[in-house]
C-alpha cells in the first residue's frame, strides 16, 4: 500500500539521521578521499517519490557513489533524492546525462521487480526511467566519489561509520527487498538482513542489458521457489 504520509515521515527521519552523523561522516570522508575542498554536509537519500513508493512492499537500491556532485550543488540544496525524483518526472539531464545507460538499467530493474512476469526482451528495449520513482535509494558513499570507484571508496566503504549509517537507513526505511548495485560485498560486510537480497552488478557495467535482466529474474524466481 502506498502511504504518502508515512513515506514523507520516513524521509524526514532520514534527513535527521544525516544531520546527526554529518560531522562524523564528513571527517571520515575527508580522511579517506583527501578532498581539498569538501562540502559542508553529506547528501540526502531515501524514498524517491512519496506518492509512488509502496512502503509495505518496499524496494531499496544500494549503489556505490555519485560523481560530479559539486559544492555549488550542495549549497543550492540540490540533493540526490530530490534530484532523482526530478529525473523520473522530466527525463535525463545534468549529471544523469553523462551515463544514460546506467539510469535506463536501473529503471528496467525497478520495472521487473514491480512486474516480474513481463517479457524481458521487450523490457530490454524500454528506458523505464520513471520506474525509478517507485524505489528507495541510497549510496554507500554519502558525499561524492571520483571518476571510478577505487581505493578511497573501498576504504570509506569498509569504515565502521559507513556500516552504522547504512544499518540505520535500512532500519528507518524497512524495505522488503534490497538490491545491491555492485555493492553486495559492502552490504554483507555491514548488514544482517532477513528480507530478499538481490546481487546485481553496477548498472553501468559493460554487460548486455538482457543478461542483467535475466540475472535479476533468476534471483526472483529462486526466492519464489523457496517461499
Go through the PLM ranges and name each one.
Residues 2-12, 140-227:
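Glycine/proline-rich loop-helix segments at beta-alpha junctions forming the active-site rim
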Residues 2-173:
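A polyanion-binding, active-site-adjacent surface
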Amino acid at each position: 500500500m502506498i502511504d504518502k504520509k508515512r513515506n514523507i515521515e520516513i524521509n524526514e527521519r532520514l534527513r535527521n539521521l544525516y544531520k546527526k552523523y554529518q560531522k562524523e561522516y564528513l571527517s571520515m570522508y575527508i580522511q579517506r578521499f583527501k578532498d581539498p575542498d569538501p562540502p559542508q554536509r553529506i547528501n540526502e537519500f531515501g524514498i524517491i517519490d512519496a506518492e509512488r513508493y509502496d512502503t509495505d512492499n518496499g524496494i531499496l537500491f544500494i549503489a556505490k557513489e555519485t560523481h560530479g556532485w559539486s559544492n555549488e550543488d550542495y549549497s543550492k540544496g540540490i540533493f540526490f533524492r530530490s534530484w532523482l525524483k526530478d529525473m523520473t518526472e522530466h527525463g535525463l539531464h545534468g549529471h544523469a546525462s553523462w551515463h544514460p545507460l546506467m539510469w535506463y538499467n536501473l529503471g528496467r530493474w525497478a520495472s521487473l521487480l514491480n512486474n516480474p512476469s513481463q517479457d524481458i526482451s521487450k523490457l530490454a528495449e524500454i528506458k523505464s526511467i520513471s520506474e525509478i520513482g517507485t524505489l528507495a535509494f541510497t549510496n554507500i558513499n554519502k558525499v561524492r566519489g571520483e571518476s571510478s570507484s577505487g581505493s578511497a571508496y573501498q576504504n570509506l566503504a569498509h569504515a565502521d561509520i559507513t556500516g552504522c549509517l547504512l544499518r540505520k537507513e535500512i532500519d528507518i526505511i524497512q524495505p522488503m527487498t534490497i538490491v545491491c548495485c555492485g555493492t553486495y560485498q559492502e552490504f554483507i560486510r555491514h548488514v544482517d538482513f532477513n528480507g530478499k537480497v538481490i546481487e546485481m552488478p553496477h548498472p553501468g557495467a559493460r554487460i548486455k542489458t538482457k543478461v542483467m535482466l535475466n540475472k535479476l529474474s533468476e534471483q526472483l524466481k529462486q526466492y519464489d521457489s523457496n517461499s
